[in-house]
Amino acid sequence: MPRRKQSHPQPVKCEGVKVDTEDSFDEGPGALVLESDLLLGQDLEFEEEEEEEEGDGHNDQLMGFERDSEGDSQGARPGLPYGLSDDESGGGRALSAESEVEEPARGPGEARGERPGPACQLCGGPTGEGPCCGAGGPGGGPPLPPRLLYSCRLCAFVSHYSSHLKRHMQTHSGEKPFRCGRCPYASAQLVNLTRHTRTHTGEKPYRCPHCPFACSSLGNLRRHQRTHTGPPTPPCPTCGFRCCAPRPTRPPSPTEQEGTMPRRSEDALILPDLSLHVPPGGTSFLPDCGQLRGEGEGLCGTGSEPLPELLFPWTCRGCGQELEEGEGSRLGTAMCGRCMRGESGGGGSGGPQGPSDKGFACSLCPFATHYPNHLARHMKTHSGEKPFRCARCPYASAHLDNLKRHQRVHTGEKPYKCPLCPYACGNLANLKRHGRIHSGDKPFRCSLCNYSCNQSMNLKRHMLRHTGEKPFRCATCAYTTGHWDNYKRHQKVHGHGGAGGPGLSAPEGWAPPHSPPSVLSTRGSAALGATGSRALHTDSP
């Protein structure tokens, strides 16, 4: 057969190739190793046919492809028969060098004569047989390697992403690189800072599609939407509580199906009597309010101290009327007899509508909420516990938010600004109250007359005129009033904390600091003309 020669010579480096001799060679020349670059010239030839010249070592071939003697289906196996020239061989004999390239390890299937297949990249075994490649990759290919898990060494945090672990480690190091430009707030995450800035701007991008509710946090919106989710369930026959949708319960276990063990429903997590339960003998939840009702106890537990004086009267949850002694004590419903008869007469045994639809209610006052943490925070107003104290003054509060709001009094910070006027304040509620001055809105209306105002405090003060109650009494004289501001101004007459001293006259002492002088003189003369000398000691109606 004609042989094709290579047209362009190429340098080939053969390192670590051991050159073996023919049978006629001795063992010394057989250890020859070629480590230099040989420039192959016109002697490089490619042999394409089967080996025809067996035993003929005097050919001029340098590299060829020898077919397996058995002729199996694995194809050609590369060989390295080198032919040297007469000058290089010395004796005119050809050297045959066979490659000692390390063959891949045979699997257990190949050892038994089976055809080799793809191996697992993790365990090295056949694909699909090991425990690490049982599922297989997408499309039936090789299995995908398992996803890495980045775990925290200080806590149980685990994530598939290293960036999440780096962000989490800032909670342990205390690093807070994201700081608010308007207040001392700082956070370890940018998303928290973005949520915080909405407290300064008043932005509420998350709105409920079912009601006018809007908030600045997506979590608060999802929590609110639970009140609209699903049809309302039937009310509880004992307390009237109703939830938005029933919770899915797990299937009963075999012991529960046989009746050997009572089944515990998931709804058992809901408080059955709309009150905060305190375990018997344990008051660590509210250390200063051990008289709260526990399991199986009445309103006052045995051996406990009497209840402190309430901050406001016990009122009915249905109509708001003040309850008499003995009313509302049945199951802590806080309902008057008329509302209870109305509920029973209507054929329903549920509680009143309105605040009672909320799941967690205070047993000492009409407060009710959907969230147990709000109830726990509210109970501090009854126990008198104030763990949050100001470092600059004796101020203390039961809520951390109130302390933060109070600290702005010392710093002079006023982050909330009115867009219509130069007004600024340190409380968002004050800004909303101020906005009613521009809008003219007066949402607080008296149910006994046509009076309306834009502040709830003014309505409470106005209601004292209908009831005639004057709770503020002077300890020095017989002066009584229903307004705390008037009481403080009256104390200046006696020289208690007033800058004007004891010589301050009564009409001037009653004057509000924000009222114009003409109104003050008219109000003072009218009070003196109506009540005479008694106007010095009694507030005008």
From Swiss-Prot:
An annotated GO cellular component of this protein is: nucleus
Mapped zinc finger ranges (C2H2-type): 150-172, 178-200, 206-228, 360-382, 388-410, 416-438, 444-466, 472-494
User: Which keywords fit this entry according to its UniProt record?
Assistant: DNA-binding, Metal-binding, Nucleus, Phosphoprotein, Repeat, Transcription, Transcription regulation, Zinc, Zinc-finger
| Subcellular localization | Nucleus
Where is the segment annotated Disordered?
Answer: 1-120, 492-541
Is this entry keyworded Protein transport?
A: no
Q: Which GO terms describe its biological process?
A: positive regulation of transcription by RNA polymerase II; retina development in camera-type eye
What's a Gene Ontology MF term here? zinc ion binding
Give the matching InterPro entries: Znf_C2H2_sf, Znf_C2H2_type
| Compositional bias of kind Basic and acidic residues | 103-115
Q: Where is the composition biased (Acidic residues)?
A: 44-55
Q: Which residues carry this modification: Phosphoserine?
A: 85, 96
**Does Transcription regulation show up as a keyword for this record?**
yes
The UniProt entry, under PANTHER family, shows: C2H2-TYPE DOMAIN-CONTAINING PROTEIN (PTHR24379:SF121), KRAB AND ZINC FINGER DOMAIN-CONTAINING (PTHR24379)
Q: What does this protein do?
A: Transcriptional regulator that plays a role in retinal development and maintenance.
So what family is this one in?
Belongs to the krueppel C2H2-type zinc-finger protein family.
Please report the name of this protein according to its UniProt entry: Zinc finger protein 513
The scientific name of the source species is Rattus norvegicus (Rat)
